[in-house]
């Protein structure tokens, strides 16, 4: 019985445990964890605080987009992922603006479950691995950590790599084309694939802004010195996290570090220039 609209746990085979005194998250995956039945009743979230509405809604959107480009995605999971994304873009701002809006609450509660169905079959990706790492280390709510990372990981996955994640289900790299497809379905416009991806990222950023979510790790009050000192542990934790194993692009350690520094500064392409000089390759 979900009491937030975001995790989709009621239909997934996943669980997360805290370890090392709450400084590390460990993901468990086994179909014995999947509930036999789920009661998805929006009455349980009608009094959900606005901040948790935003955090968990961002988690829902992250589930949808990561399932969409996963190496384990298929037409069945794609349909669920895109339906969840559409519902989130339409109803999350309304649920956040007016927590008593029953239609918005109901649709977001269902969107979270639908996204859960998508990623319980397709899994998630590097966004979750990174969010788990710094979220556990600095006590950041999971959905908020995902929200900060999402624009950066979409850009990262949309850049066609020289080496992508091997899978019997993947014959060529297609994450950029699937993001472009998502932009088409969301009615964001654009001609070339690159334009559509840029429009998708911009739409995600506008949505996060409308929810008053922090757009950088620095906004959480974590100093650059604290973040830099934690970086070796964060990169190791992210690399050890199984979430990225289904990511379309195989991340290198230096790429995980770069993504974390981009998220630390936040806000679009200028974040690339925010990586401290001593960490640049």
Language model segments and positions:
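Glycine-rich phosphate/pyrophosphate-binding beta-alpha loops
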Residues: 6, 113-146, 240-245
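Short alpha-helical scaffolding segments that buttress acidic/His motifs in well-ordered protein cores
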Residues: 61-65, 108-116, 130, 150-154, ...
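Gly/Pro-rich interdomain helix-loop hinge
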Residues: 144-229, 269-270, 275-281
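Flexible, glycine/charged-enriched surface loops at secondary-structure junctions
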Residues: 72-80, 95-107, 122-127, 164-165, ...
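C-terminal and late-domain segments of enzyme folds
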Residues: 50-114, 118
């Amino acid at each position: 019985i979900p009491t937030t609209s975001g995790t989709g746990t009621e239909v997934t085979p996943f669980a997360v445990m805290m370890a090392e005194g709450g400084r590390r998250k460990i993901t468990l995956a086994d179909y014995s964890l999947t509930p036999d039945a789920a009661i998805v009743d929006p009455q349980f979230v009608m009094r959900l605080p606005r901040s948790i509405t935003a955090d968990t809604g961002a988690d829902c959107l992250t589930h949808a987009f990561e399932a969409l480009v996963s190496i384990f995605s298929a037409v069945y999971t794609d349909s669920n992922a895109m339906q969840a994304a559409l519902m989130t873009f339409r109803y999350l701002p309304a649920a956040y603006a007016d927590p008593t809006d029953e239609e918005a609450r109901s649709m977001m509660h269902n969107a979270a479950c639908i996204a859960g169905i998508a990623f319980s079959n397709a899994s998630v990706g590097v966004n979750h691995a990174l969010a788990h790492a710094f979220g556990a280390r600095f006590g950041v709510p999971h959905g908020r950590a995902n929200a900060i990372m999402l624009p950066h990981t979409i850009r990262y996955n949309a850049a066609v790599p020289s080496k992508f994640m091997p899978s019997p289900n993947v014959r060529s790299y297609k994450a950029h084309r699937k993001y472009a497809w998502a932009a088409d379905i969301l009615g964001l416009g654009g001609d070339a694939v690159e334009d559509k991806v840029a429009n998708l990222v911009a739409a995600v950023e506008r949505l996060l802004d409308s929810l008053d979510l922090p757009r950088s790790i620095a906004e959480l009050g974590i100093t650059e010195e604290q973040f830099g000192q934690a970086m070796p542990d964060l990169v190791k934790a992210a690399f050890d996290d199984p979430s990225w194993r289904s990511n379309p692009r195989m991340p290198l350690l230096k790429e995980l570090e770069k993504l974390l520094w981009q998220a630390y500064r936040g806000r679009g392409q200028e974040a690339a220039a925010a990586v401290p000089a001593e960490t640049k390759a």
